[in-house]
Amino acid sequence: SEDACPNLHNLYQNYSNGYFKVPSVGAGTANTEFEVLTGMNLRYFGPGEYPYKTYSKKHPTESAATALASLGYGTHALHDNTGNFYSRANVFNNMGFDTFTSKEFMNVLQTTENGWAKDEILTQHIMEAMDTTKQEDFVFTVSVQGHGNYPETQVIENPKIKVEGIEDEALKNKWEYYVNQVYEMDQFVGDLIKAVEERNEPSVVVFYGDHLPTMGLKAEDLKSRYLYNTNYVIWDNIGLQKDDKNIPAYQLMSEVLNRLDIHSGTVFNYHQQRKGTKNYLSDLELLQYDILYGKQYVYNGKAPITEGHMVMGIRNVSLSSIVPQLNSGYSLYGENFTKYSRVYVNGEKQKSSFLNNTRINLSETELKDGDVIQVGQVGSSDTIFRMSDKYTYQNGQLVKQEGTATDKSKSWVDQDYDVN
């Protein structure tokens, strides 16, 4: 069968890469994210703990976003799953990101046979995030296409990659499904690199695997002989020297920043200065305790972040017109609608149906002059992530009330529940 990862394998030949030690296997994407974004080692948390569900969803947390924001970078998070998944909206806000574009702000047209968004949707949103600012940007993107579970029956009619040599039919089908998702994700890798190259801006793109899939793998099945190894690669267009090495997830950002001669962020600086020295890990444990649960002596009274300011999404939803339907209800026209858009009249959510990014139908709504209409992007548990400006219905027209959209300094109210 043909190579499932031609783009990644090409990157491995030409750019810095190696094994990537992660804190989990089979699940636990959020824990690998946490190590990457904070530089902290999950070894020093409780057994089975997810900091996204415990500490970081409730407390401001120094991160790569705060480190780069202090140098003038715009900071953006993207994920083609829902905003409350692993409490990411709360977590990314507490980590100091400027924006978070979740699935609620994407019109996902292509999904896997298991219903996960295909990663091809991400390229346009990564480009849009970088277009929102004039300065440099840090864009942290979490993809979801390769997510399990993996079907034991054949669900892909004409697979690009065919798996052979496995007698167990159910296991063969699981691997065939997975490897075909990997192939399409690799195509996304190639498309993203091409899109970044076409911008002709100094850029670094880091790809890493969060954990191995739930396939009953054993260490002897793997080339690295270690279940907690994935791979990473650092692409750039600025002439960085190829330097292959194996690194743990919590050292990734400090490694990348060091190659760029960037020395910002308490924990990242610690790794850059102390890695490989005596008591490096035991002192890291003390540093983490001081930052998370201690008196934050290391900050000397000046914490890098005391509260979040994040806005959900990049693009504003706007309304242009509303047209009565023949029998009852209305068609609402505008821009940037998604299937997570909900219409509110005088603060009450209406029964609506999403047709496309410019039209929503309201089948049971009755309007009178003076009614106020808004459209919100709504996640699980009715979390309103972002609201449009208010529009007054007057003589069949929509009159925009300028400046009435969600406060741009922060677009939603923190939720204290878990949705994972």
Could you say what each language-model-derived stretch is?
Residues 1-361, 365-420:
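Solvent-exposed soluble domains appended to multi-pass membrane proteins
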